[in-house]
UniProtKB/Swiss-Prot annotation:
Function: Required for both formation and activity of the chloroplast NAD(P)H dehydrogenase (NDH) complex of the photosynthetic electron transport chain. Functions in assembly or stabilization of the NDH complex; probably involved, together with NdhO and NdhH, in the formation of an NDH subcomplex A assembly intermediate (NAI500).
Record note on disruption phenotype: Specifically defective in the accumulation of subcomplex A, a stroma-protruding arm of the chloroplast NADH dehydrogenase-like complex (NDH).
Protein name per Swiss-Prot or TrEMBL: Protein CHLORORESPIRATORY REDUCTION 41, chloroplastic
One BP annotation, GO: NADH dehydrogenase complex (plastoquinone) assembly
InterPro entries: Chloroplast_NDH_Assembly
Transit peptide: 1-38
Species the sequence originates in: Arabidopsis thaliana (Mouse-ear cress)
Compartments (UniProt record): Plastid, Chloroplast; Plastid, Chloroplast stroma
Alphabetized UniProt keyword annotations: Chloroplast, Coiled coil, Plastid, Transit peptide
GO CC aspect terms: chloroplast; chloroplast stroma
Domain of life, per lineage: Eukaryota
The protein's assembly and partners: Biogenesis factor component of the plastidial NDH subcomplex A.
Length: 211
């Protein structure tokens, strides 16, 4: 056996034998995924962001003092606190029943004091009175007071002389009718004289109203 192995060695060495030994290699392949974003050149997307973003010059350019905010005055605030009652608002149409469209003259006439005396005395004659003498005396006092007031208005130049003279004439006629009331005996005559005196008193009221 040893001789045969020694014989084979030179023969093997003399021949060029190429023996391919398979080599087992473990190769690991790494798979990588690449993500790519494609930028489009569409101008509409840019315009959307431009519209949403405010301009730099429009930010913080108006001061707090110049900002257009209407401020309420202090007097108006106080006035709102006091008005807590229920008030009827003004109607849209002013030509309605409870609101007058014609202006009412509230100025009193010049002879309103004389008118007041005579109106009260005329109402007194329409009632039941104590006696005829007291009614005639009250008429004399009222007529004298009306004359004094008319003379004051005449001296101040507010009433003309002819109006004062007319008032004095009517008052004198009223005093004459009251004297007839005091002298009357029958009830029929008494009622007639009283009605005549009341008519003279109403006439004196109209004269005083025309001052």
């Amino acid at each position: 056996m040893a001789s045969t192995s020694t014989l084979l060695l030179p023969s093997l060495s003399s021949k060029n034998l190429h023996i391919a030994v398979p080599i087992r290699t473990n190769s690991f392949v790494r798979r990588t995924t690449k993500f790519s974003t494609k930028c489009s050149s569409n101008p509409e997307s840019k315009d959307q962001f431009i519209n949403l973003t405010p301009a730099p010059e429009s930010i913080n350019t108006t001061s707090a003092e110049k900002f257009p905010i209407e401020k309420r005055r202090r007097s108006e605030i106080i006035r709102d606190r006091t008005q807590r009652g229920i008030e009827k608002p003004e109607p849209p149409n002013f030509e309605i029943g409870w609101k007058r469209t014609k202006e009412i003259n509230l100025e009193k006439p010049k002879g309103y004091v004389i008118m007041d005396f005579l109106e009260k005395f005329e109402a007194l004659m329409a009632r039941e009175f104590g006696s005829k003498e007291l009614l005639a005396k009250a008429g004399e006092i009222v007529a004298e007071r009306a004359r004094e007031e008319a003379e004051v208005l005449r001296d101040e130049g507010k009433v003309e002389e002819r109006m004062v003279t007319e008032l004095f004439r009517v008052l004198k006629l009223m005093e004459m009718d009251l004297a007839m009331v005091k002298a009357s005996v029958k009830d029929e005559t008494l009622s007639q004289r009283i009605e005549q005196a009341r008519a003279r008193c109403r006439q004196a009221i109209l004269v005083a109203n025309s001052f």
